[in-house]
Amino acid sequence: MKNEMWSGRFSGASDELLKEFNASLNVDKTLFNEDIQGSIAHATMLESCGILKKEELDAIVKGLEQVRSEIEQGKFIFDIKDEDIHMAIEKRLSEIIGSEIGGRLHTARSRNDQVATDFKLFVKKSHIELIKLLKELIQTMLEHAKVHKKTIMPSFTHLQHAQPVSFSFYILAYAFMLMRDVKRLQNSLELAGFSPLGSCACAGTSYATNRELSAKILGFKDIMPNAMDGVSDRDFVLDLLYDIAVIFTHTSRLCEEMILFSSSEFSFITISDSFSTGSSIMPQKKNPDVCELIRGKTGRVYGNLISLLTIMKALPLAYNKDMQEDKEGLFDSVKTAKDSLIILNVMLKEIRINKENMLNACKKGHLLATDLADYLVREKNIPFRKAHFIVGNVVAQAEVQGIDISEIKDLSKIDPIFDEKAMELLNFEFSLNSKQSEGSSSIASVEKQIQILQEFIKKL
């Protein structure tokens, strides 16, 4: 039996295996709202161009709103035989208002531009949702930054002790990463602002339509100027997948450090019991599962990006069925990102900063060595490389004594070039605030950085 909406050209029915293999309804039904939104805009445009009558438009809009209500209330029956969400909605619409009017909705439109429009609307909405979540996470980081300007901790390079910084300075580094993530999403949202609706299969339509009107109704800033590009383009999906992948690069780095810093070896932070789990055999265990899962999910969102890049890499123009595989990975990445950002934000709100442990850790690894070298250059006019060698000898002597250079009582006993003033440098807070360059760890600089971020999120 031939009951597919495209079956007029065929003399026989599709094999049941093909129907099941070909169908995307279980995935793309996520787009029901966008599909109805796009159809209402398309029908409105058709009526304005005299292609639909006013009473036909009214019936279509009323019918589509009923379909939306049925889906939202769980009353809509999804049938795999309908193939995709577009056909499922159109079939139900025709059942409600009759095929004579319902069948007119698809005038001057193809599923090719229809799905591209639906998907782009979903992507645009996802950008906005992710920007909001990133804003909230930045705000949480800013709250920590405001409180911990004088909470001193070691910074690391190569995971070795480097220089003293504040926890404020540390967490602001991640806040600025997230600021770039927001800007990246904003740029991608700008690029996604062109409507493919009305491109039809690939070459446009012989009807005198008004693509600018439907684009305006749907909130696009303009139309895609080439119909073939309109239905072939999935850059907007790749952009969002890439943006999410970079977000996870940043959150994964943060989570890795939260895992390290909450371990017994560091004990810089304590993660709330609400966001930790135990062991089935070891009673003492408190595991940072949230951080580990976000770190693990990073591979998942990377995979979704690589998957679509591979799908698109050699596709001829215009639409190909391969592109049906573009949605599942995107839906997964968006949900994964939203879920992860929400729980990471709440977890960060509740972490406890162990100030004393952070400060004690600064007394290992000779964090003040660079300050001593800079002092020799600045006060004794010694070339930096020579100063580097002199301070390296101080470090070696301290290690022989089994102490950190911050614990040395008299530097002049190691090298007479050091005077009493040099001893003032052996202070972590002094080191922190001695930095004068823009973007440094000093309290004055940290306050400027906080202001930059506050002004940025105010505009979101």
From Swiss-Prot:
Looking at the UniProt record for this protein, which Gene Ontology cellular component terms does it annotate, in alphabetical order? cytosol
Q: Which SUPFAM superfamilies match?
A: L-aspartase-like
Membrane-crossing segments per the record: none
| Xref: Pfam families | ASL_C2, Lyase_1
Name the top EC class. lyase
Give the matching PROSITE patterns: FUMARATE_LYASES (PS00163)
Q: Which Gene3D superfamilies match?
A: Fumarase/aspartase (C-terminal domain), Fumarase/aspartase (Central domain), Fumarase/aspartase (N-terminal domain)
Q: Which reaction does it catalyse?
A: 2-(N(omega)-L-arginino)succinate = fumarate + L-arginine
**Molecular functions per Gene Ontology:** argininosuccinate lyase activity
For this protein, the Enzyme Commission number is 4.3.2.1
Protein name, please?
Argininosuccinate lyase
